[in-house]
């Protein structure tokens, strides 16, 4: 029985109670309406054995391969990153928290990397933590429902401060069910985007009255936004929030005291965010993604800025819908800026209203200017986009469509509010919306008459919205808007049976859970999917992967890091021995002469590598060299390569002197996970196949040893002669120090709150 709907209802009821207790205007009937709309949108995943993920994408790769399935006929291939990245990371985070362990380290991909530092894992997201009691598949839907409810409720609260109830509901619907949320529903981007109205609401509240409670809530929004897992969207959010605060302070003449308060809030928010932000900043420069962008940043024109790519801002389904034929740029990156046709028309209506009344300091003028600014960047108008691109050089700024949709939703509420009193804004809005529809209908090129007919049919729901607006019955407009968004975006996240979400197969069940690593050749058991089954893979499909590790694979195996779906192709590579790979998964029929066949079935083959090395072992010889160019010529079974040896001169001579094959060797005996007994006849370098990152702590009989980077990308350490117990632990100071800073900040805030009179500023 799927009671996710009931669990979400209980959480939402508690949230509504807190909002009402804070004396914010949220009528119970409005909250009930929002919950009912979300249940309608997610009905089957909330109530039955379903999940709204394109799980049939898994049928493209072994061991789930199905005949006749291609990326062109699966339900929505655009969401493949969910199945191959985000869902496995989510399950790892959940498993770690359920074991009462902070999800700091991912040992199941690429010989290990920091999991929490990969912000897209959302290791500290409040929504992820709230969904922990639910099974994995149901938790996915619960998080989606909470994002929608958060976006709907806070958008309503923000709009309600200026507009009547029905316009505020319409604005909430335009944002909460718009493509900015729905297209990225299961992505971290939507988690951060859902907090957009909250940030703007808190700026309003602090501008109105500065109280202890409002200060504290605003400060905690910082870590909540960062924990959402998309730094790029968080940075864009902060940029527009700063503009909004400046507008209130200067254009609305509310004084600079607000800016001082917001600066203090930002400082406290940064301190509270330390355990989230510090690990990310510590590891970011060492990742393959960052190192790639250092060489080749997002230069040149803003992507997706041509007319076909801008067309989905007016109608997302204009070029077709999945899994049907697509004849234009109907991809997630172009489709995430739609908040209903009125959002476009409202810009023209509110502009006419401001000009007619000659009132240019009102809040609606900020919405006009912010939306125009975002559009000029998306449209790549150089005078605006070039400086912005220089400021956000590492960001994909075409994703400002999300902020554009947010402002469009707010303008929808403003238009519905003003049209009750004046006709000019309504007529200007209808004219502007019709003009946009005519432009995309007449200036786009269609491959055939059928495609053109489909495109024109997609404009009918928008026409119905405009007809409803003509009646000036605002409730009818809100209903038509919801229907328009349903037709435009509801099918984007297809509903599939829950049993299709990473199902067990005979091949998966045949793999021993012995602790040694696996590798899949080609697309077999695609990287990250292994994590769902608790299997450690040496492959990576992750922008946070270790840059040096990727470089090593490129040097020694011909791995192509520029291939988005980079594959391991050589099942006979001796590097597999060093990487502790015992199990090799292949597609059906693949032959590996060096390895022993353990399983052969229609879902693939499983081989055992009998020459695998342990995770930790003693290197017989040590080579000190300033670079790793000689690595392809070195037998990593017997020789370790280092750039530095931070030991005494005598120990260095001992380590670097050649050791014949007949010389006694050190013995490394594992006693527990990452714990071992080392018996060394002389100074010995113990090497591992665990990726080297900041944060490793090594002790020998309780005494600290310095972690070394060996063989280009791995962890090693030097032990003295004799016997001793070694413990290796990942204890990043960036996290634990950051957590201490955050806790100290909370203590100071509590003390300050206790000494503050109720209601004081």
Locate the predicted segments by residue:
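Contiguous transmembrane helix-bundle modules in multi-pass membrane proteins
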Residues: 1-32, 188, 194, 202, ...
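Hydrophobic alpha-helical membrane-insertion signals
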Residues: 7-114, 284-287, 333, 493, ...
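Hydrophobic alpha-helical transmembrane segments
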Residues: 7-12, 118-124, 138-153, 335-350, ...
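Active-site-proximal, structured, solvent-exposed surfaces of multi-pass membrane proteins
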Residues: 375, 539, 582, 602, ...
């Amino acid at each position: 029985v799927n009671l996710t709907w009931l669990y979400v209802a209980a959480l939402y009821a508690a949230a509504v109670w807190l909002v009402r207790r804070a004396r914010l205007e949220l009528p119970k009937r409005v909250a009930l309406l929002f919950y009912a709309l979300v249940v309608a949108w997610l009905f089957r995943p909330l109530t039955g054995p379903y999940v709204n993920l394109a799980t049939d994408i898994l049928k493209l790769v072994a061991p789930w391969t199905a005949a006749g399935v291609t990326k062109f006929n699966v339900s929505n291939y655009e969401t493949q990153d969910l199945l191959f990245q985000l869902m496995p990371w989510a399950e790892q985070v959940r498993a770690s928290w359920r074991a009462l362990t902070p999800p700091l380290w991912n040992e199941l991909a690429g010989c290990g990397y920091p999991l929490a530092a990969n912000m897209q894992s959302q290791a500290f997201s409040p929504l992820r933590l709230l969904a922990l009691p639910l099974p994995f598949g149901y938790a996915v839907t619960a998080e989606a429902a909470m994002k929608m409810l958060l976006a709907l409720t806070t958008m309503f609260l923000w709009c309600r401060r200026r507009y009547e109830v029905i316009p505020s509901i319409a604005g909430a619907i335009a944002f909460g069910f718009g493509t900015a949320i729905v297209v990225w529903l299961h992505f971290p981007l939507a988690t951060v985007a859902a907090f957009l109205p909250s940030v703007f609401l808190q700026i309003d509240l602090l501008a109105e009255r500065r109280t202890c409670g409002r200060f504290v809530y605003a400060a905690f929004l910082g870590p909540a936004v960062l924990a959402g897992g998309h730094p790029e969207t968080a940075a864009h959010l902060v940029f527009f929030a700063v503009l909004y605060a400046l507008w209130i302070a200067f254009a609305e003449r509310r004084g600079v005291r607000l800016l001082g308060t917001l600066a203090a809030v930002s400082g406290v928010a940064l301190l509270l965010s330390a355990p989230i932000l510090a690990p990310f900043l510590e590891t970011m420069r060492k990742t393959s993604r960052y190192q790639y962008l250092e060489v080749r940043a997002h230069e040149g024109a803003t992507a997706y800025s041509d007319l076909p790519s801008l067309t989905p801002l007016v109608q997302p389904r204009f070029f077709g819908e999945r899994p049907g034929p697509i004849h234009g740029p109907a991809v997630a990156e172009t489709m995430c800026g739609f908040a209903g046709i009125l959002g476009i028309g409202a810009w023209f209506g509110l502009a006419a209203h401001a000009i007619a009344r000659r009132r240019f300091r009102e809040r609606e003028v900020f919405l006009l200017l912010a939306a125009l600014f975002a559009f000029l960047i998306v449209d790549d108008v150089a005078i605006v986009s070039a400086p912005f691109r220089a400021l956000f050089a590492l960001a994909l700024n075409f994703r400002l469509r999300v902020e554009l949709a947010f402002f469009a939703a707010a303008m929808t509420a403003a238009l519905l509010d003003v049209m009750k009193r004046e006709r000019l804004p309504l007529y200007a809005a209808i004219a502007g919306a019709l003009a946009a529809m005519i432009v995309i209908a007449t200036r786009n090129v269609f491959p055939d008459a059928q495609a053109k007919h489909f495109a024109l049919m997609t404009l009918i729901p928008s026409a119905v919205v405009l007809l409803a607006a003509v009646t000036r019955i605002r409730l009818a407009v809100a209903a038509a808007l919801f229907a328009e968004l349903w037709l435009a975006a509801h099918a984007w996240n297809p509903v599939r049976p829950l049993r299709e979400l990473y199902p067990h197969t005979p091949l998966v069940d045949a793999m021993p859970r012995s602790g040694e690593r696996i590798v899949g050749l080609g697309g077999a058991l695609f990287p990250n999917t292994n994590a769902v089954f608790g299997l450690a893979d040496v492959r990576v499909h992750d922008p946070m992967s270790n840059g040096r590790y990727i470089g090593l694979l490129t040097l020694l195996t011909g791995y192509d890091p520029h291939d988005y779906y980079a594959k391991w192709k050589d099942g006979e590579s001796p590097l597999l021995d060093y990487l502790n790979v015992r199990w090799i998964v292949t597609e059906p029929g693949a032959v590996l002469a060096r390895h022993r066949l353990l399983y052969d079935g229609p879902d693939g083959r499983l081989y055992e590598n009998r020459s695998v090395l342990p995770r930790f072992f003693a290197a017989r010889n040590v080579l000190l060299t300033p670079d790793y160019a000689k690595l392809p010529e070195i037998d990593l079974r017997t020789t370790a390569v280092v750039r530095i040896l931070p030991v005494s001169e005598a120990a260095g001579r001992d380590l670097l002197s050649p050791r014949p094959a007949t010389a006694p060797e050190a013995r490394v005996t594992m006693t527990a996970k990452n714990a071992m007994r080392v018996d060394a006849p002389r100074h010995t370098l113990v090497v591992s196949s665990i990726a080297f990152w900041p944060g490793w702590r090594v002790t020998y009989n309780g005494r600290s040893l310095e972690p070394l980077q060996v063989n280009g990308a791995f962890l090693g350490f030097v032990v003295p002669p004799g016997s001793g117990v070694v413990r290796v632990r990942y204890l990043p100071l960036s996290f634990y120090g950051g957590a201490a800073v955050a806790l100290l900040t909370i203590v100071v805030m509590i003390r300050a709150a206790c000494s503050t009179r109720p209601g004081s500023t």
